[in-house]
Amino acid sequence: MSYGRPPPDVEGMTSLKVDNLTYRTSPDTLRRVFEKYGRVGDVYIPRDRYTKESRGFAFVRFHDKRDAEDAMDAMDGAVLDGRELRVQMARYGRPPDSHHSRRGPPPRRYGSSGYGRRSRSPRRRRRSRSRSRSRSRSRSRSRYSRSKSRSRTRSRSRSTSKSRSARRSKSKSSSVSRSRSRSRSRSRSRSPPPTSKRESNSRSRSKSPPKSPEEEGAVSS
């Protein structure tokens, strides 16, 4: 368990990955906790190269697979040093120590999210972030263009409806005026022309009966 020694022979062992550890949790503490469920072969806590502090996760090796499964079921969600542990089966083997990796090939990088998962390079993260940003921008642009097109279609439909209503009102007013003019012309044609006073007097005189000779003599005397 000392960090200066090379890793032991872990072939045939079952490894558990323990996440969400505090910086003060030691390998001895983990061994005491996990030995309740079976024989522990190895406990390894990766540390930072420069600060030498714990990276917040560890690997616990069991000689028997059934003991490892029992420990995983019991310790997943348990609280240790004020932290709720997350325990799962490790996917790959334990990485070698830093001093031992100088002689051999460079070790694989193991992230804190899952054992055996390679940490993504910052370039890939930047690319993924830029892609997500471009996607969000394109989505926002498409939504903005859709709202613009909808507002345009609405304004067009409103203007067309207004023009149609104006045309209808104009046609109605013109038809009403035409009907009024027609009725006036008909009433004028039906009414007889007015007669003057002279014509009426002459007609009344012509209609009066002729006077007798006796009436004429009396008038002359």
Swiss-Prot record:
Pfam families: RRM_1. GO terms for molecular function: pre-mRNA binding; RNA binding. InterPro entries: Nucleotide-bd_a/b_plait_sf, RBD_domain_sf, RNA-bind/splicing_reg, RRM_dom, RRM_dom_euk. Residues 117-171, 179-189 have a biased composition (Basic residues). It is found in: Nucleus. GO terms for biological process: mRNA processing; regulation of alternative mRNA splicing, via spliceosome; RNA splicing. Residues 14-92 form the RRM domain. GO terms for cellular component: nuclear speck; spliceosomal complex. Its main location: nucleus. Belongs to the splicing factor SR family. This is Serine/arginine-rich splicing factor 2. It comes from Gallus gallus (Chicken).
